[in-house]
Amino acid sequence: YKRQVRGGTEKIKVSAGANYFDQQGMVVTGSGYQKFSLRLNLDFEIAKWISFGINSSYAMTKQDREDGNFNDFITSSPLAEIYDADGKYTKYINSEGNYNPLYRAEHYGREVTRDNYRLNFFMDVKPFKGFNYRLNTSVYNQTSEDGSYKDSQYPGGGGTAVLDESRTQNWLVENIVTYKVPIRNKKHQLTLTGVQSVDHNGSKSIGYSVENLPVDKDWNFISQGEFTGKPRRQFNENNLVSFMARAQYSLLDRYLLNVAVRRDGSSRFGKENKWGTFPSAAFAWRVNQESFLRDVSWIDNLKLRVSYGIVGNQNGIGNYTTLGLADNKEYEFGNVFQMGYLPSKELSNPNLKWEQSATANFGVDFSFFNGRLNGTVEYYNTHTKDLLVKRSLNASLGYTTMLDNLGKTKSSGIDLSLNGDVVRTKEFTWTLGTNFSMYKNEIVRIDDTLDENGKPASQVAQGWIIGE
C-alpha cells in the first residue's frame, strides 16, 4: 500500500508519503516480513535571502523467521511422513532420525524488529550578493531487537532463549561558506569556499542467552531462565573533524585553476597524530576556445587537465586500536567462575598516523562532430606511504601482531573511454562505447628493512598482492 501527498505555495512546498508492505513466508505459516514507513519533505523560503528544508523518514520493520535453512524444507523427500495419526507434525521424517523441519519450526520462534529514523536539515543564507552560507545537518538512528526461543519440545534440547539489542546513532554537522569575489574585469572569476564539519558514528549492543526456562515462553520472559555465560556487550564510537579551504579561479572561462587544502582530525589515532593535512591543486585548459581552433567547426570540446593531490585514509585502523585492547577470560576461583581480563594479542601502537596517497593525474576530454564522437584519455600515478598494516611480532614478547605504518606502494595506469553515435536521427539513435584500462601495482617498500640485494625484505607472505 502506498499513499503520497504533495502541495504548497510559492514559498512553501510539502511532500508526504506512507507505505505499508506485508509479505508472508514461503514455507512456514507465521513467518514473513512487514514494513511500515513514513516520509516528510519540506522546503520553506522565509525571505529572498534565507530558506531551509527538511527531509525526514521513519521505517519500522518486523521479520518473523523460521528455524533452520531453507534447504531443509526444499530438499526433504516428498515421501517423508510429516504428520502422525493425529494430524500433528512428526518429530522425525524417516527411520534414520532426520528431524522434521516443520516440527522444529513449530517449537521455535524468532522475531527481528528494527526502527530507523533519518532527518536531514539544510539552511541557505544569502545576506548579500555573492555570499552564501549553507548549513547541512543529518541524524540517523536505528534501534533493533533480535529475539529467539526454543520451547521444551524442540529437538536436541529446548527451553532456551536469546535476546540481542542494539542501537546505532550517526550525525553530521557541516558548515559551508561560499563567496564569489566581485571583480570589475569580467574576464576573471574567483570563488572562495570554506567548509567545516563534524562527523560522529556510534553504536552499542547487548545480548543475553538463557536456558532452563520454567515454562514455554518466548524471549520476553528471558529473566526467568538461567543465564549461560556473561552478557555480551559491545560499544563503538568514532569522530572526524574536518576543515577545508578552496579557491577556484577562471580566466576567460578558458583557463581554470582549483587549489584546496583540508585538515582532518580523527579520534582513531593517538594524541600526537590525530590530525592530517592534505593539499590538492588542479588546472584545466579549454583548448578549443583558443583563437587558432575557434573556427574549427568539428571540434565541440577539447580540454586538457592536470591535477595533483594528497588524500588520507583512516579505514585501516579500529576505533580503539591506539589505546590498547583487553580480552575477557573466565577463570574458576572458589568453585565459581569469575571474569578476568588479559591484554590483547595485538600490541597497541599509539604512534599510528594517517595513511597518505599522493596522485598525479593527466587527462584529455574531447567531443567532436556535434557530440557524435566523445571520450576521455587519462593517465594517473599514485604513491602511497605509511600503509596501515599488521606487523608480525615474535610470540615470546607476549604479542603476535601490531598495527603499524609500514611501507610504500606505487600504482599507475591509463584509462581510455570512447563513445560514438553510429546512427543519429530524430527517431533513432545507435550509440557504441568502449573502455580500456591498463594498470600496474608495485610494492616499493614494506618496511625500512632491505635484503642483501637492496630489495624490500619479507612480509610479502602476510597477504600483500604484487601487481604485474
Segments from the language model and where they lie:
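Transmembrane beta-barrel wall of Gram-negative outer-membrane proteins
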Residues: 2-66, 117-120
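Short, glycine-/polar-rich solvent-exposed loops and beta-turns at beta-strand/coil boundaries
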Residues: 31-32, 68-70, 295-300
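Extracellular/periplasmic, surface-exposed regions of secreted and cell-surface proteins
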Residues: 41-50, 55-60, 94-150, 160-468
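Low-complexity intrinsically disordered tracts that form flexible linkers/tails across taxa
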Residues: 61-77, 446-450
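Immediate N-terminus of the mature polypeptide
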Residues: 65-67, 87, 112
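Flexible, solvent-exposed loop segments that connect beta-strands
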Residues: 155-158
